[in-house]
């Protein structure tokens, strides 16, 4: 399942990273079940294996969210402005894994 998730996520990370002008230091898939993704202070972006079963527009939303953390390391208004700028599927509703 992790390999399938990476196959689905990596092209979207590459697309949005290029569009947004950011570069993650690495992209990986984890066994996390309580969060869709995370971004470390060193630029490593991690995604839950559970994304493999989600629709493409949801994957894009998670990818954009995590890549925005490469610029804004918080959930400030500037962070959410950036999310809205790049995520055409932005929804205020929060989705919980599992």
Predicted feature locations:
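Walker B catalytic acidic pair
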Residues: 66
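Active-site-proximal or metal-binding-adjacent scaffold patches in catalytic folds
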Residues: 1-61, 70-98
């Amino acid at each position: 399942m992790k390999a399938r998730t990476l196959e689905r996520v990596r092209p979207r990370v590459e697309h949005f990273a290029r569009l947004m002008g950011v570069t993650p230091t690495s992209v990986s898939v984890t066994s996390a079940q309580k969060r869709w993704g995370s971004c470390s202070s060193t630029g490593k972006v991690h995604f839950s294996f559970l994304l493999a079963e989600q629709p493409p527009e949801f994957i894009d939303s998670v990818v954009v969210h995590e890549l925005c953390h490469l610029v804004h390391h918080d959930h400030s208004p500037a962070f959410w402005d950036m999310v809205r700028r790049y995520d055409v599927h932005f929804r205020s509703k929060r989705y919980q894994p599992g």
